[in-house]
C-alpha cells in the first residue's frame, strides 16, 4: 500500500477543515470496512494523499426517537441501529435491510453514514491493479463504460447515468447535444430530434453536408467497431427540418420592437439571423453579392453543397420574417453609420473574402488565379478556361475544391502542391478532410505534400509552371505557422497552363475599416472573429454574438436559449450493426461536371439505423447500498454539513460519483418520519449465495393498507439502476385497489416498465417482478 497521511478528526468541523485543505485529494474513513481494502488493491481512480478518520468523533452515534420520527447519527453502527428497540418496533424495513448487509463482524464496524456514502461495487471499477493493471472505465477517466460491451450481468437494468460532458458534444464547436437528438430518433421521434438540433444549429441541412465532423473521431463507438455516422444522421434531420420549414422556422410569437442588422449572409449571418428573429427582433440581412448565402452559395462547389439547398435554407429563414437585402455593399452603397442610425444593433459577419498572396516571383503573370475568386466565378455559372495542366497551391478544403472543379471541367492534368504532409497524426498534416483528399485522388488529381512554391515560372507573360522546394516543417511545437525549407536545390518542377493560389484568406480591409468606424452596438461573428473557419465554427460564433446582442438589448433578461436538463438515466445501446456506408456517386458520374451532388444522402431507415448505433454513453454501475433503498422507501432525509435533502435526491448518481456529497461535505444525521398508520413494511433481497451478499435485486416497500385496500405505497428498487429507483408505475397500479393476486401481478409488471435490459441481465426483470409481487402481498 502506498504511503498516505492519516488524520484523526476530533470534530465535524475539524474533519471538514482537513477535507478542504486537501482540495479533493483526501478520503474519509467512517467505518473502515471498505476504503483501506480499495486502497490496498489500488482500485480507486486516484490514490488519496490523506485519510481522515472520523470514527472517533463523539456524539454522532445516537438513535433517537422524537415527536417527528427517528433521528440517527451518521456514525451509528449498523448493528446498533438494527438492534434498537425503536427501529425494530416502528421501522422494521430499516432493520431488515441492515441485517442483509455483509456479515455480523462488518455490521459491528460499519456506520450508517459510511454505508450510504460507499463507492460502487462494479467489478470493472474495483478490478485490482496488481492482477493486470487497472481497467480504465468511465469512472476512472476512460472514454466508455466497460460493462456496455463486456460482462454486464450485474449492471443496471434501467439505463446508464449520463455523462456531464459527452465526447462528441464537447468536440463540436456548437456543443450540439448529439446523444440527445440521437435518442429521440431511436424512439421514433424525428420531430423531437429536430427541435433539439435546432437549439444548437439552425442550418443542419447545410452542416449535414459540409461539416468537418469534429465529433466523429471522438465517438466511443469506434472502440467497439466504427464511429456513428453523425453527419449522415444530421443531414437526415436537416432534410426533415427543411421539408417542415413552416414548423421549425415559424415567426416568433412575440415581437420585441427591436431591430438588428446583420452584415453578411454566410453561415454566421444566417445562424445569427435565426436566433435573433426567434427572440422576437426584426432582422435584416445585407449581402454584397447578387444572391444571399455568402460562402455557402458563392464558394462551396455545388457537388458538395447544392445551390438548391442553400436557396431553400434562405427561403425558410425568410419565412420567419427575416428580410434579405442582396446586392448591397455595406460601406459603399450604405454605410455602417446609416445602419447604426436605423437599427438597435449590428452583427458584422462579413466573412474573409480576400485571398492571401503567395509572395513569390511570377505572381503577377496571366493565368494565375486566386481560389475564392475562381470558385465564386464558377458558382455564378462562369466556366473560366484553365487549360490542360493546372497546379493548385494549398492543402486545405478550398484548395481541394478548386482542384476538383478544374478536373471536372476538363483540365486533364491537375496537381495540388502543399506545405503540409499526409501523415494524419502529424501537427503538419493537410487541413483538408481525408474524405476530400480521397475523392480528389479518385478523380485523378495528384497530391504533392511537403513542397513549397519557390517561384512561378512565366513564359511570354503567362504562367508556365512552378518550381518547388522541400518543406521540412510547417508549424512550431506551439502550433504557430513558421514553415522551414530546404533551399539548396529545387525539389520539383511542374508545368502548368494555370496556377490557382489557395493558401488562405483574410477579411477585406474595407470591411474591417467600415466596422471600426461604426458606432452603437456592433458585434462580430464568424470569420471576422476567428479568421477562416468551418461552417459549424461560424454557427458557434454566431451564438456568442447573439448572446451579446441579447445582453445589450435586454440587460438582465435570461438567455433565449436555455439547455434543458437531460434525463435521469439514458438508454445504453449496443446494437450490433456496422456503420452505414456513405452513399456516393461513382467516379465516372462525378466527372461529368460540378452540378450533381456527390453524396445523394441516406434514407430515413438508414438514418434511424445509424442513430441506434449511438451508445448514449454513460455509467451502468448500480447503487450498492441496501440501507439507501430502505431510506428512500421510508421517505428519509439526509442532513449533511451543507444541506438537508431527501434520500432520493441524495443518491443523485453521476458518471463519476454516486451521491451529491461534495469533496468537503459529510453526513451528520439521518431523519426518518413516522410511518403512516397501517403501513406494511417489507425488505426483499435476492443474492446469488448468502443473503449478506451484495444484491442482484432488492425491493423496499411501504404499503399503507386499510380494510384490505391500498391507500398509498412507496416501492423502491435496488441494484437495478445507478441509484435507488422509485417504481412509480407499480405504486400507481396499487393505489385504491384491493391487495390481491391480480393487483400484485399488475404492480410487478408495472415495476419493470421502461426497463432497458443489457445483453446479459434480462433475468433481472423476472427477479424484480417476483420480489415486487411478494412485497405487495406481504410475503
PLM segments and residue spans:
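Ferredoxin-type iron-sulfur electron-transfer modules in oxidoreductases and energy-metabolism complexes
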Residues: 133, 141, 153-156, 160-166, ...
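C-terminal structural segment of proteins
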Residues: 1-173, 624-779
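Rossmann-like dinucleotide-binding cores of NAD(P)H-dependent redox enzymes
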Residues: 282-285, 289-319, 324, 378, ...
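Rossmann-like dinucleotide/flavin-binding elements
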Residues: 263-286, 325-340, 354-356, 373-434, ...
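Long, charged amphipathic helices and adjacent flexible linkers at domain junctions
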Residues: 244-260, 471, 565-578
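Surface-exposed acidic, glycine/proline-enriched linker/cap segments
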Residues: 138-162, 246, 372-393, 471, ...
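FAD-binding core/adjacent interface of flavoenzyme oxidoreductases
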Residues: 181, 213-263, 279, 307-314, ...
Amino acid at each position: 500500500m502506498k504511503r498516505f497521511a492519516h488524520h484523526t478528526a476530533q470534530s465535524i468541523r475539524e474533519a471538514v477543515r482537513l477535507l478542504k485543505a486537501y482540495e479533493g485529494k483526501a478520503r474519509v474513513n467512517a467505518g473502515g470496512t471498505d476504503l483501506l481494502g480499495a486502497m490496498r488493491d489500488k482500485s480507486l481512480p486516484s490514490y488519496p494523499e490523506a485519510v481522515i478518520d472520523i470514527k472517533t468523533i463523539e456524539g454522532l452515534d445516537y438513535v433517537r426517537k422524537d415527536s417527528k420520527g427517528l433521528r440517527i447519527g451518521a456514525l451509528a453502527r449498523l448493528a446498533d441501529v438494527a438492534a434498537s428497540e425503536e427501529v425494530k418496533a416502528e421501522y422494521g424495513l430499516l432493520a431488515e435491510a441492515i441485517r442483509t448487509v455483509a456479515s455480523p463482524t462488518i455490521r459491528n464496524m460499519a456506520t450508517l453514514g459510511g454505508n450510504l456514502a460507499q463507492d460502487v461495487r462494479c467489478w470493472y471499477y474495483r478490478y485490482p491493479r496488481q492482477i493486470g493493471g487497472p481497467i480504465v472505465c468511465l469512472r476512472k477517466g476512460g472514454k466508455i463504460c466497460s460493462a456496455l460491451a463486456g460482462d454486464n450481468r450485474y449492471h443496471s437494468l434501467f439505463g446508464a447515468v449520463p455523462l456531464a460532458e459527452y465526447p462528441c458534444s464537447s468536440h463540436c464547436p456548437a456543443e450540439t447535444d448529439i446523444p440527445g437528438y440521437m435518442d429521440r430518433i431511436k424512439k421514433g421521434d424525428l420531430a423531437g430530434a429536430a427541435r433539439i438540433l435546432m437549439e444548437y444549429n439552425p442550418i443542419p441541412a447545410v452542416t449535414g453536408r459540409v461539416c468537418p465532423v469534429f465529433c466523429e473521431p471522438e465517438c466511443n463507438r469506434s472502440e467497439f467497431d466504427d464511429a456513428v455516422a453523425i453527419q449522415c444522421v444530421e443531414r437526415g434531420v436537416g432534410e426533415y427540418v427543411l421539408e417542415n420549414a413552416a414548423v421549425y422556422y415559424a415567426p416568433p410569437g412575440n415581437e420585441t420592437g427591436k431591430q438588428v442588422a446583420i452584415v453578411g449572409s454566410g453561415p454566421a449571418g444566417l445562424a445569427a439571423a435565426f436566433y435573433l428573429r426567434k427572440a422576437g427582433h426584426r432582422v435584416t440581412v445585407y449581402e454584397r453579392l447578387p444572391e444571399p448565402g455568402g460562402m455557402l452559395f458563392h464558394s462551396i462547389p455545388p457537388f458538395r453543397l447544392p445551390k438548391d439547398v442553400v436557396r431553400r435554407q434562405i427561403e425558410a429563414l425568410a419565412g420567419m420574417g427575416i428580410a434579405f437585402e442582396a446586392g448591397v455593399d455595406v460601406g459603399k452603397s450604405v454605410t455602417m453609420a446609416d445602419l447604426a442610425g436605423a437599427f438597435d444593433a449590428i452583427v458584422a459577419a462579413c466573412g474573409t473574402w480576400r485571398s492571401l498572396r503567395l509572395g513569390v516571383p511570377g505572381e503577377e503573370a496571366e493565368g494565375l488565379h486566386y481560389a475564392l475568386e475562381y470558385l465564386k466565378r464558377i458558382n455564378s455559372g462562369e466556366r473560366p478556361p484553365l487549360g490542360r495542366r493546372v497546379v493548385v497551391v494549398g492543402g486545405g478544403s478550398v484548395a481541394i475544391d478548386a482542384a476538383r472543379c478544374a478536373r471536372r471541367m476538363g483540365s486533364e492534368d491537375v496537381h495540388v502542391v502543399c506545405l503540409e504532409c499526409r501523415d494524419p497524426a502529424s501537427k503538419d498534416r493537410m487541413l483538408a478532410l481525408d474524405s476530400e483528399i480521397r475523392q480528389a485522388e479518385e478523380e485523378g488529381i495528384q497530391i504533392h505534400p511537403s513542397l513549397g512554391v519557390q517561384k512561378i515560372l512565366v513564359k511570354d507573360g503567362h504562367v508556365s509552371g512552378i518550381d518547388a522546394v522541400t518543406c521540412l516543417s510547417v508549424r512550431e511545437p506551439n502550433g504557430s505557422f513558421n514553415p522551414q525549407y530546404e533551399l539548396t536545390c529545387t525539389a520539383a518542377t511542374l508545368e502548368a497552363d494555370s496556377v490557382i493560389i489557395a493558401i488562405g484568406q483574410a477579411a477585406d480591409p474595407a470591411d474591417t475599416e467600415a466596422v471600426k468606424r461604426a458606432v452603437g452596438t456592433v458585434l462580430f461573428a464568424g470569420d471576422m472573429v476567428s479568421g477562416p473557419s468551418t461552417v459549424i465554427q461560424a454557427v458557434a460564433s454566431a451564438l456568442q454574438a447573439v448572446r451579446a446582442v441579447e445582453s445589450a438589448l435586454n440587460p438582465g433578461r435570461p438567455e433565449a436559449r436555455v439547455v434543458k436538463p437531460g434525463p435521469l438515466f439514458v438508454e445504453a445501446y449496443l446494437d450490433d450493426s456496422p456503420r452505414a456506408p456513405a452513399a456516393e456517386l461513382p467516379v465516372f458520374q462525378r466527372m461529368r461536371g460540378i452540378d450533381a451532388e456527390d453524396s445523394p444522402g441516406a434514407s430515413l431507415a438508414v438514418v434511424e439505423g445509424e442513430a441506434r448505433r449511438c451508445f448514449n454513453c454513460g455509467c451502468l454501475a448500480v447503487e450498492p447500498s441496501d440501507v439507501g433503498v430502505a431510506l428512500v422507501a421510508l421517505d428519509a432525509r439526509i442532513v449533511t454539513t451543507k444541506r438537508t435533502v431527501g434520500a432520493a435526491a441524495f443518491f443523485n448518481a453521476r458518471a463519476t460519483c454516486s451521491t451529491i456529497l461534495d469533496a468537503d461535505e459529510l453526513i451528520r444525521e439521518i431523519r426518518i418520519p413516522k410511518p403512516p398508520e397501517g403501513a406494511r413494511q417489507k425488505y426483499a433481497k435476492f443474492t446469488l449465495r448468502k443473503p449478506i451478499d451484495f444484491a442482484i435485486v432488492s425491493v423496499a416497500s411501504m404499503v399503507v393498507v386499510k380494510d384490505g385496500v391500498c391507500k398509498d405505497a412507496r416501492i423502491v428498487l435496488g441494484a437495478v439502476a445507478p441509484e435507488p429507483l422509485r417504481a412509480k408505475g407499480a405504486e400507481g397500479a396499487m393505489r385504491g385497489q384491493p391487495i390481491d393476486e391480480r393487483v400484485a401481478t399488475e404492480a410487478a409488471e408495472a415495476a419493470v416498465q421502461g426497463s432497458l435490459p443489457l445483453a446479459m441481465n434480462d433475468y433481472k426483470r423476472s427477479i424484480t417482478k417476483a420480489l415486487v409481487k411478494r412485497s405487495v402481498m406481504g410475503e
